[in-house]
């Protein structure tokens, strides 16, 4: 494949940072900000990630229960305040984390009076299984009654109805539950403008993810991105051209803003003329000089200095910067490559 075709993706601006912020101090809800993105890619990536997050991540869920003397969902449960439908709904909300096994047996055995909670569930197989919401109420048991329940917990992805879970291995008398395996509860996103230099025609993707605690939100987003990457690989039907590594490495070590030409900074005419007379072409030339050196420039006063300081601050730059690798040996070729990309 030619370098010309490779520019279809290599010339696009790429995100330089991802910011993570917890919402309401809840570690299970995070907002992630990604910028800058090419115009339109914010919506494309946001929608794709949201769909994968809500459909394709794996988790664990209780898929069936068995209570002695109870044959179906409409049967009464002796000594329990709630009917079986409410009990099933409460059991579906039990959050189970299991990493090393695909399926395990759980046991619930309580003597009343008691408020039966998820923390009373025990693992009969001695597997590495954790109940993440032990205070979650399942039912209320009256005095003088016992409640025994065998539960099966399985791994899966997405949402699976009871009709797809029933199989020949199910114990007689087992009641199957709709299983929501996905650890992601809610996903929302929005796209705003992002600024690169003085240009605002780029996208900023703001995506908020809420999970049940089995996986944290930023890890869930990473898994969704990995799923998309894996699925899209099949469409790449060409060999990529290897870039020149030395130049690529050098470009990565230099702040790309330093390769901008000063005329792109939208300065006053007076400041532009002063920089031109001093042969200051790139932003790198500018920040390599000290304020004292700049004030010695003909027709360059404190007002022009303050103007430049304000502009540089927008890029987190200042006068007198050292150890910035300026000027690079192949300045012209790097600057040309920078222009092609931006």
Curated annotation (Swiss-Prot):
Recorded catalytic activity of this chain's protein: RNA(n) + a ribonucleoside 5'-triphosphate = RNA(n+1) + diphosphate
GO molecular function list: DNA binding; DNA-directed RNA polymerase activity; protein dimerization activity
Enzyme class: transferase
GO biological process: DNA-templated transcription
Gene3D superfamilies xref list: 5' to 3' exonuclease, C-terminal subdomain (1.10.150.20), DNA-directed RNA polymerase, insert domain (2.170.120.12), RNA polymerase, RBP11-like subunit (3.30.1360.10)
Region (Alpha C-terminal domain (alpha-CTD)): 254-342
SMART domains: RPOLD
Keyword Transcription in annotation: yes
Alphabetical UniProt keywords: DNA-directed RNA polymerase, Nucleotidyltransferase, Transcription, Transferase
Alpha N-terminal domain (alpha-NTD): region residues: 1-239
EC number(s) on file: 2.7.7.6
UniProt record similarity statement: Belongs to the RNA polymerase alpha chain family.
Subunit comment: Homodimer. The RNAP catalytic core consists of 2 alpha, 1 beta, 1 beta' and 1 omega subunit. When a sigma factor is associated with the core the holoenzyme is formed, which can initiate transcription.
Cited function: DNA-dependent RNA polymerase catalyzes the transcription of DNA into RNA using the four ribonucleoside triphosphates as substrates.
Protein name stated in the entry: DNA-directed RNA polymerase subunit alpha
Organism: Orientia tsutsugamushi (strain Ikeda)
Phylogenetic placement of the source organism: Bacteria, Pseudomonadati, Pseudomonadota, Alphaproteobacteria, Rickettsiales
Encoding gene per record: rpoA
């Amino acid at each position: 494949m030619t370098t010309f075709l490779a520019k279809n993706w290599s010339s696009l601006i790429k995100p330089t940072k991802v910011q993570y912020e917890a919402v309401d101090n809840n570690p299970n809800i995070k907002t992630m900000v990604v910028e800058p993105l090419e115009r339109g890619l914010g919506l494309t990536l946001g929608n794709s990630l949201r769909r994968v997050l809500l459909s394709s991540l794996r988790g664990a869920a209780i898929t069936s229960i068995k209570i002695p003397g109870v044959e179906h969902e409409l049967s009464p449960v002796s000594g329990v305040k709630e009917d079986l439908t409410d009990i099933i709904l409460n059991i579906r909300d039990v959050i189970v984390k299991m990493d090393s096994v695909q399926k395990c047996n759980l046991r619930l055995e309580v003597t009343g009076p008691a408020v039966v909670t998820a923390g009373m569930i025990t693992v009969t197989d001695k597997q590495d299984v954790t109940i993440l919401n032990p205070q979650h109420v399942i039912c209320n048991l009256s005095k003088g009654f016992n409640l025994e329940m065998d539960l099966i917990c399985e791994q899966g992805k997405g949402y699976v109805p009871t009709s797809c879970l029933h199989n020949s291995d199910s114990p007689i008398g087992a009641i199957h539950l709709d299983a929501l395996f996905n650890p992601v509860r809610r996903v929302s996103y929005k796209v705003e403008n992002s600024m690169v230099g003085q240009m605002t025609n780029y996208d900023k993707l703001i995506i908020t993810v809420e999970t049940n605690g089995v996986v944290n939100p930023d890890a869930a987003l990473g898994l969704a991105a990995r799923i998309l990457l894996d699925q899209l690989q099949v469409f790449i039907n060409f060999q990529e051209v290897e870039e020149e590594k030395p130049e690529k490495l050098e470009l990565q070590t230099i702040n790309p803003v330093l390769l901008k030409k000063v005329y792109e900074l939208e300065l006053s005419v007076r400041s532009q003329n002063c920089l031109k007379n001093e042969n200051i072409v790139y932003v790198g030339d500018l920040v390599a000089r000290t304020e004292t050196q700049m004030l010695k420039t003909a027709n360059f006063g404190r007002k022009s200095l303050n103007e430049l300081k304000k502009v540089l601050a927008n890029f987190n730059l200042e006068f007198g910067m050292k150890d910035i690798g300026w000027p690079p040996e192949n300045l012209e070729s790097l600057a040309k490559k920078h222009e092609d990309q931006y």
